[in-house]
Regions:
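SF2 helicase catalytic motif II
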Residues: 144-146, 155-197, 201
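Interdomain helical connector at the RecA1-RecA2 junction of SF1/SF2 helicase-like NTPases
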Residues: 194, 205-252
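Conserved Walker A/P-loop ATP-binding site and its immediately adjacent core
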Residues: 56-61, 66-67, 71-103, 146
């Protein structure tokens, strides 16, 4: 008689199932969003928070405050790929208690515009960024690639007195060959924009730092941990993580 296989997880975590993850305050903010909003006055803000914790909406709250209460003229939301641009579609935030709605005019969500984001066909999108900067409209959404090309074409001075928010910030690196990283370093050195950086994983697989220490020191950091996120779910009792070795065909 063969003994039953015993599986011993490498990591075993139990959770309190507080339900806090899905609870909102009087402004319609979940816990991570409320924590980030408390630091809305920072010129340089780094938000480290897991997927599904509400980073996109947290940025909406912060950007609206910077536009309405901190004197910034425009907000530019920069995402790694076009599909993520949908995370910043219009949101009726006043329905849940906030004092303003999030609105992006259709012509300024460049993630919805046709055409690839390589330099051969992106000229029209770069021109659109220039047109946005000259307009009185508050919010533009574009990809990392479009933003890089626009900065190269227009220069960093064109973005003075604006909020630049970079989603999936770990795509940036301190390597000189990382164009977006070099541009952000130049923005920090000029010190005439506000930057919000958001990521669920503040590290890179190639071991290159995301920011150099002297630049990272300029940022106030908001951290919302995976444990806090999972502990706030109502129905997740425990999580076991392990690894197993097999001998012979895997399907057996």
């Amino acid at each position: 008689m063969t003994e039953p296989i015993k599986q011993v997880p490498s990591v075993s975590v139990t959770y309190k199932r507080t339900g806090a993850t899905n609870k909102s305050n009087e402004l319609g903010m979940r816990p991570m969003q409320e924590r980030a909003y408390e630091r809305r006055g920072e010129q340089y803000l780094l938000i480290k928070s897991p997927p599904a914790s509400g980073k996109s909406r947290a940025l909406m709250f912060i950007a609206l405050d910077k536009l309405h209460n901190q004197g910034l003229s425009q907000a530019i939301i920069v995402v790694p790929e076009r599909s993520i641009g949908a995370s910043f579609n219009n949101e009726p935030l006043t329905r849940w208690g906030f004092w303003a709605d999030w609105e992006v005019r259709p012509q300024w969500n460049l993630c919805n515009a046709p055409g690839a984001d390589d330099i051969r066909v992106a000229k029209s999108k770069v021109q659109a960024v220039g047109a946005f900067l000259a307009s009185g409209d508050p919010v533009l959404v574009c990809t990392h690639a479009t933003f890089r090309f626009a900065v190269e074409e227009l220069g960093i001075e064109a973005f003075d007195n604006r909020l630049i928010a970079v989603d999936e910030f770990h795509h940036v690196s301190a390597d000189d060959d990382n164009v977006l990283g070099s541009q952000l370093k130049a923005f920090i050195a000029r010190d005439k924009v506000h930057l919000v950086a958001m990521t669920g994983s503040y590290f890179r697989g190639d071991a290159v730092p995301v920011l150099m220490p002297e630049d990272e020191a300029r940022f106030a950091t908001v951290t919302y941990t995976y444990y806090e996120q999972l502990n706030g779910y109502e129905h997740l009792k425990a999580l076991d993580i392990g690894y197993f070795f097999y001998n012979g065909p895997y399907v057996d």
